A protein has these predicted regions:
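Glycine/tyrosine- and acidic-biased, solvent-exposed loop/turn segments at the edges of beta-strands
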Residues: 1-111
């Protein structure tokens, strides 16, 4: 039976046979770690996904994917800030570690 209410928790994202799958248990050294709101056994609401190499997405989730306002930070300090849709940049602005604009996505297309 699926969890239908939203609550705080931790999940791990792993690639299994070419598909990305959410698990309740994982290894922070090799798997992506999600901390935040969970419903229906996947991220839904506000949360943070941390990659083993230090990359991080902080923001809104829907049905296990980045959806809504968020910030994706790459390990070199580059950030993409704005709206994400279905796990990808939708309407975002990219900034280097010094805060200079380095790019934009508008309706999912890099400008």
């Amino acid at each position: 039976m699926s969890e239908k209410s939203s609550n705080q928790g931790v999940l791990f994202l792993k690639e299994v046979n070419g598909k990305w799958v959410w698990f309740k248990d994982g290894d922070e050294k090799t798997d992506l770690k999600y901390e935040g709101e969970i419903s229906n056994e996947v991220p839904n609401g506000q949360g943070t996904l941390t990659y083993p190499d230090g990359q991080k997405y902080e923001g809104e989730w829907k049905d296990g994917e980045w959806n809504g306002q968020g910030i994706f930070t790459i390990s070199d300090g580059t950030k993409y800030v704005g709206e994400f849709k279905d796990g990808t940049d939708w309407n975002t602005t990219g900034y280097d570690k010094d805060g200079n604009i380095i790019g934009r996505y508008v309706n999912g297309t890099e400008q």
